[in-house]
């Protein structure tokens, strides 16, 4: 970041932070905002397009919109006539779509046969300047800068309180498992709103291996924000390093909190929640009264069941770093990964695309809040899932949030010997069938796409050394059998890989990402890119 730009950003930080810390938010205020924004979606979308797209000659979206022959006047006519989602569907059909890799700056946009190079910062909003810069997790490639806007946090804070109250997780003692800058801009809950019992009691920070020391600029910014929060009377807990081998500490805290107050809430990724649940069971702890609020990765049925076996409850929300909360966990879900789309803040539609010859309904997100530091207009999320209108009868449904998104999965894929598998074919086998047959948990198995010394792509099945396996070939055979049942294409892919020697077993523990996520499918190239991004950040 250029020096003057950085100084300007930190000046905004010093000026804006006290106002955010003084902001009084309540669940009642959040409910009022939800109703107001739900009623104003069309006006909010048009205002955002006018100020952040059509008024900005550098906006990448202008290339797409003008190639589609769409001017602001056309949208002013279409949006009231068709509604938000139908208008976005019309734009998608005309090619107004930004692919996930383009939004991350890894591929150029192609408009009318012409390549247009783009960077992540090209999608910055001209009407909402950032106050801090964090970094993405790097789980899908090299880490990129993530702008943090206090204005945007302030616009969502009361709403988050309202959602937590409706989900029944506002008030009990809470522990958060999040990092510090640049991994997370949560500051241990300092900016989540100090009222309504929302401050966490404990703040655990995952310890990476090997340890990573944040740059000086991140350490200074982090300490400044936390110190200012404490000066404003917010009793933010001190971060406690949490190695993976010591996650039972969280379970012991939760059991004690239930004893003291009757309930406890732990905020973590699904993978971290599963680790805590397994640690509790191994130590004979009953997590009855504990609720895990999760996000950042899908809550699969296998993870959910293992967590429930500990006595705890678990809900999962759908987040995207650039868009915020896309889906809020339904408390009367149709499955483990069922959320109410936060339609007051975002619009979510689907676009059919081909992934290795198979059609998937990719999710496209549009941000409706003008306070967002990134402009998102029909941006692919790298996920697919099911969108449906459903009346579930839960408190969020009563607010008019009838659009649900469920069964969200990434269409990450493994490719070797010219044959590719979509991740959904592999997930059930890795997370359910192999642990049931050979022991361990969904955290102990992972498939990785890698290159050998000669440049051939190979598939590595990682199995944690903690799982006692006498015959590794039996695991490979079980993997093949599971894929044979999954689909014809999965069976054919595995047969070819096995025949060409493209599969090997590695007895190492599958690593978690910087935010405590564990993906059952990974690419060594993505891992290497993430490490390079971390080193150059």
Set out the residue ranges of the language-model regions.
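AMP-binding adenylation
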Residues: 1-46, 59, 187, 199, ...
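Active-site phosphate/ATP/adenylate-binding loop shared across adenylate-forming ligases
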Residues: 4, 8, 12-21, 36-310, ...
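Short loop/turn motifs at secondary-structure junctions and domain boundaries
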Residues: 122-127, 340-341, 501-503
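Short loop/turn microsegments at loop-to-beta-strand junctions
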Residues: 127, 346, 506-508
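Short, acidic, Ser/Thr-enriched surface-loop or helix-capping motifs
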Residues: 138, 353-354, 513
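Residues that form or flank phosphate/diphosphate-binding pockets in enzymes
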Residues: 275, 302, 358, 421-424, ...
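Conserved AMP-binding/adenylate-forming
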Residues: 290, 294, 298-392
